[in-house]
Amino acid sequence: MPELPEVEVSRLGVSPHLIGNTITRVVVRERRMRWPIPQEVAKVEGQKVTAVKRRAKYLLIETAQGTLILHLGMSGKLRVIDASTPVIKHDHVDIVLSTGKCLRFNDPRRFGAVLYQAPDTHIPMLDNLGPEPLTDDFDDTRLFTLSRNRKGPVKNFIMDNAIVVGVGNIYANEALFLAGIDPRRAAGNISAARYKSLTATIKQVLAKAIEQGGTTLKDFAQTDGKPGYFAQHLNVYGRKGEPCEACGKAIESKVIGQRNTFFCTRCQR
């Protein structure tokens, strides 16, 4: 599943091809996505793209006549290609540009979304979202304060989009390892000092992932559909039974909040 770094890398990759150019057509081949694609997406046709933003895992393609809201879901990916490129299976939407290019949205599982929001109106799905993790709005004081009296596992707590957006499963595992915190520990039983460390490691792993993803930006202009996700060194995620690189003890795995969780019982307390 694309997580925040992958979506941010997508934004960085497609932005130069969109901003300042005009959307000539929005071609919808399949409307049955996570939510039905509305007819109103056509309202951006003939409009110049003024900005491409990200909020949580939503991409916002802004024009004077409204905003297209994209979500990659479980399996979605974006390609900037020649508009004449033959369609392949699961190519559900094209945002065709005046340059002869198009932004093509491919989504095999159809859990993604393409929605329209009129100018100066409220975007309901962005309600109740916490701060972006790489901004100053996300700090250890907020995290510690909101954690008080929370009995659930700290991993679930930091993955709650009302607390902070975009800390998906991979990066929650990695941040907790670097902070030395057991993901099973109750969020309310962690000290302010340890939340300071955890806030720093969340920012660290997300920033590093985005930086590493920057080397794949060339993929967004290719026709082979490479998603632009990036291989990176992971300390615990997906490494059940392998030795911890810090202490040598075998990495353990447990399902927490319906997600596989990986940790070292020696390094994480």
Curated annotation (Swiss-Prot):
Cofactor: Zn(2+)
Zinc finger boundaries on the chain: FPG-type: 235-269
EC code(s) of this entry: 3.2.2.23, 4.2.99.18
GO terms for biological process, alphabetical: base-excision repair
Binding locations of DNA: H90, R109, R150
Record note on cofactor: Binds 1 zinc ion per subunit.
Top-level taxon of the source organism: Bacteria
Enzymatic reactions: Hydrolysis of DNA containing ring-opened 7-methylguanine residues, releasing 2,6-diamino-4-hydroxy-5-(N-methyl)formamidopyrimidine; 2'-deoxyribonucleotide-(2'-deoxyribose 5'-phosphate)-2'-deoxyribonucleotide-DNA = a 3'-end 2'-deoxyribonucleotide-(2,3-dehydro-2,3-deoxyribose 5'-phosphate)-DNA + a 5'-end 5'-phospho-2'-deoxyribonucleoside-DNA + H(+)
CDD domains with a match to the protein in the record: EcFpg-like_N
Alphabetized UniProt keyword annotations: DNA damage, DNA repair, DNA-binding, Glycosidase, Hydrolase, Lyase, Metal-binding, Multifunctional enzyme, Zinc, Zinc-finger
PROSITE patterns to which the protein is assigned, alphabetical: FPG_CAT, ZF_FPG_1, ZF_FPG_2
GO MF entries: 8-oxo-7,8-dihydroguanine DNA N-glycosylase activity; class I DNA-(apurinic or apyrimidinic site) endonuclease activity; damaged DNA binding; zinc ion binding
InterPro entries (UniProt xref): DNA_glyclase/AP_lyase_DNA-bd, DNA_glyclase_Znf_dom_DNA_BS, Formamido-pyr_DNA_Glyclase, FPG_cat, MutM-like_N-ter, Ribosomal_uS13-like_H2TH, Znf_DNA_glyclase/AP_lyase, Znf_FPG/IleRS
Coiled-coil regions listed in the entry: none
Active site as annotated: P2, E3, K57, R259
Known role: Involved in base excision repair of DNA damaged by oxidation or by mutagenic agents. Acts as a DNA glycosylase that recognizes and removes damaged bases. Has a preference for oxidized purines, such as 7,8-dihydro-8-oxoguanine (8-oxoG). Has AP (apurinic/apyrimidinic) lyase activity and introduces nicks in the DNA strand. Cleaves the DNA backbone by beta-delta elimination to generate a single-strand break at the site of the removed base with both 3'- and 5'-phosphates.
Family recorded in the similarity comment: Belongs to the FPG family.
Subunit structure: Monomer.
PANTHER family, sorted: FORMAMIDOPYRIMIDINE-DNA GLYCOSYLASE
Name of this chain's protein: Formamidopyrimidine-DNA glycosylase
Organism: Alteromonas mediterranea (strain DSM 17117 / CIP 110805 / LMG 28347 / Deep ecotype)
Phylogenetic placement of the source organism: Bacteria, Pseudomonadati, Pseudomonadota, Gammaproteobacteria, Alteromonadales
GN (gene name): mutM
